[in-house]
C-alpha cells in the first residue's frame, strides 16, 4: 500500500447559506456580545447573565446550535436563532495523514473579497500534546522568496470569529469538548486536551492583522472559556517591529521570529520586510519583549537552505546576533515546492550547524517534517481546489508546529 493509500479523506456537509447572513457571536468580546443582545431587546438586568450563559455554551461546552443550550429559555433560543449564528465554517475537505497529522480546508464568506475564501488549518498530535496551526490572513503581503505562501497575493484579513473558528472546529472534529467522543483509530495525545497548544503560523502575517488576532487569542486564553495557557500559545512574525512589544504587553503569548538569515543583505532577499525593519531593530525589539526570561524564551525559526544560509560562518553569526537573548532556535529542513530556486541543506550540514549552536548553549532542535503525505509540511500546504485552479497558492509554515510553547 502506498503512503497516499493510507490517507483518510472526508468532505463533511457544507455550512448553510442562511447562517452566513447572520452575525456570529463567536469572536465577540463580552462587551460586544452584551451590546448585540441589548440591541435585540434583551433586558438590561439580564445582559450579564445571558452573556455568561452564552460564553459557557460556546467556549466551554462547544455547541454550534442554539437549540443545544438547554438552560436557555426557548423564546430566547428562538431570538438567538433568528438574529445570530454560532455555526462552524464549511469544511471543504479533511485529510488525515498516516502519522496522525490532520489538515482541514475551510471556506469562509467573501466579506469584500468578491468570492468565498479558503484557508487550511493543520493539527499535529504528539504523545504529550496536540498542536493546531492557525491562519490569520487569506494570502500574505510578504514575499519571502523561499516561502510558497509568498506566491499568493493577500486577499483579506481574517476576522476574530474566523480565527477562533479554526480552533473550535478542530476541537469539534477531535472530540475535544465535554461529552464528545474522539474519532476511532485517531493518533492523538494519550491524556488531557487533544488541542493543548496553538501556533499562529498559518497563512499571513499575524501582526498585520493585530486587532483581530489579539481579540481571538484573548478569547482563546480566557479562563472562563477555552482556557488555553498563554505559555502554550505561540505567535510567529516575520518581524513587524512596532507590534512586537504590543504583542507581549497586550496579548502576553509566546513569541517566534521567522529569522532565516543573520546578515541584512541576505535577509533582505529571503524576508523582504527586513528592508523596513532590519536585524538590529528586530533583535532590539526581542530584547525588550515583555515577560522575556529563561523560562519564556523567544523561538527563532531558521529554514536550512543549501549553500545560502547553512555555513558554520552563518552559525557563528547566529550566536553573535542572539547573544543575551533568551532563545531557542528551530532549524527547519527546507521543503522544496514547484518553481523554487532553493534546495534543502544536506542532512550532514544541518547536523553540524545544530551541533555548533548546541555547543554555544542554545537548544536547536531539528524539526522533523510531519504530514508530508497530505502536503501538510512546511511550504507544502495548498488546497485541492487551489491546485486545480492554480490561480492562488494556499501554503504556510506548518512543519515548525511541534514543541512550540512551554510544557506547563
Swiss-Prot record:
Q: What is its main location?
A: cytoplasm
Radical SAM core domain residues: 126-375
Q: So where does S-adenosyl-L-methionine get bound?
A: 204-205, 236, 258-260, 335
- Please name one Pfam family that this protein belongs to: Radical_SAM
Any binding details for the cofactor?
Answer: Binds 1 [4Fe-4S] cluster. The cluster is coordinated with 3 cysteines and an exchangeable S-adenosyl-L-methionine.
GO CC annotation: what is one?
cytoplasm
Q: SUPFAM superfamilies per the record?
A: Radical SAM enzymes
Q: What does this protein do?
A: Specifically methylates position 2 of adenine 2503 in 23S rRNA and position 2 of adenine 37 in tRNAs. m2A2503 modification seems to play a crucial role in the proofreading step occurring at the peptidyl transferase center and thus would serve to optimize ribosomal fidelity.
What PANTHER family has UniProt attached to this entry? Answer: 23S RRNA METHYLTRANSFERASE (PTHR30544), RADICAL SAM CORE DOMAIN-CONTAINING PROTEIN (PTHR30544:SF5)
Which protein, by its recorded name, is this?
Dual-specificity RNA methyltransferase RlmN
Organism for this UniProt entry: Rhizobium johnstonii (strain DSM 114642 / LMG 32736 / 3841)
Please spell out the taxonomic lineage of the organism that makes this protein: Bacteria, Pseudomonadati, Pseudomonadota, Alphaproteobacteria, Hyphomicrobiales
Question: Gene of origin?
Answer: rlmN
Amino acid at each position: 500500500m502506498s503512503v497516499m493509500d493510507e490517507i483518510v479523506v472526508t468532505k463533511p456537509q457544507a455550512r448553510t447559506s442562511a447562517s452566513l447572513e447572520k452575525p456570529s457571536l463567536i469572536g465577540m468580546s463580552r462587551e460586544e456580545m452584551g451590546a448585540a443582545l441589548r440591541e435585540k431587546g434583551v433586558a438590561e438586568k439580564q445582559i450579564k447573565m445571558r452573556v455568561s450563559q452564552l460564553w459557557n455554551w460556546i467556549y466551554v461546552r462547544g455547541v454550534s446550535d442554539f437549540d443545544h443550550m438547554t438552560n436557555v429559555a426557548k423564546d430566547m433560543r428562538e431570538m438567538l436563532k433568528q438574529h445570530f449564528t454560532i455555526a462552524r465554517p464549511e469544511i471543504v475537505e479533511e485529510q488525515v495523514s498516516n502519522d496522525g497529522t490532520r489538515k482541514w480546508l475551510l471556506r469562509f464568506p467573501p466579506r469584500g473579497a468578491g468570492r468565498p475564501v479558503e484557508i487550511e488549518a493543520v493539527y499535529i498530535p504528539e504523545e504529550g500534546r496536540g498542536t493546531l496551526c492557525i491562519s490569520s490572513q487569506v494570502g500574505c503581503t510578504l514575499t519571502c522568496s523561499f516561502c510558497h505562501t509568498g506566491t499568493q497575493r493577500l486577499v483579506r484579513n481574517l476576522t476574530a470569529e474566523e480565527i477562533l473558528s479554526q480552533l473550535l472546529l478542530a476541537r469539534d472534529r477531535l472530540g475535544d469538548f465535554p461529552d464528545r467522543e474522539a474519532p476511532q483509530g485517531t493518533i492523538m495525545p494519550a491524556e488531557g486536551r487533544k488541542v493543548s497548544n496553538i501556533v499562529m503560523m498559518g497563512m499571513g502575517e499575524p501582526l498585520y492583522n493585530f486587532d483581530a488576532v489579539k481579540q481571538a487569542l484573548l478569547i482563546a486564553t480566557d479562563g472562563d472559556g477555552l482556557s488555553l495557557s498563554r505559555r502554550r500559545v505561540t505567535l510567529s512574525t516575520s518581524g513587524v517591529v512596532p507590534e512586537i512589544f504590543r504583542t507581549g504587553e497586550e496579548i502576553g503569548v509566546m513569541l517566534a521570529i521567522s529569522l532565516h538569515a543573520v546578515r541584512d543583505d541576505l535577509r533582505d532577499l529571503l524576508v523582504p520586510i527586513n528592508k523596513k525593519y532590519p536585524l538590529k531593530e528586530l533583535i532590539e525589539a526581542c530584547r525588550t519583549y515583555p515577560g522575556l526570561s529563561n523560562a519564556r524564551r523567544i523561538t527563532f525559526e531558521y529554514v536550512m537552505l543549501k549553500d545560502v544560509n547553512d555555513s558554520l560562518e552563518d552559525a557563528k553569526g547566529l550566536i553573535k546576533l542572539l547573544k543575551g537573548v533568551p532563545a531557542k532556535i528551530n532549524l527547519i529542513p527546507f521543503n522544496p515546492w514547484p518553481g523554487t530556486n532553493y534546495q534543502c541543506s544536506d542532512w550532514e550540514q544541518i547536523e553540524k550547524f545544530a551541533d555548533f549552536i548546541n555547543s554555544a548553549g542554545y537548544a536547536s532542535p531539528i524539526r522533523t517534517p510531519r504530514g508530508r503525505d497530505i502536503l501538510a509540511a512546511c511550504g507544502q500546504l495548498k488546497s485541492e481546489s487551489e491546485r486545480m485552479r492554480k490561480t492562488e497558492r494556499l501554503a504556510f509554515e506548518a512543519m515548525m508546529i511541534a514543541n512550540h510553547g512551554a510544557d506547563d
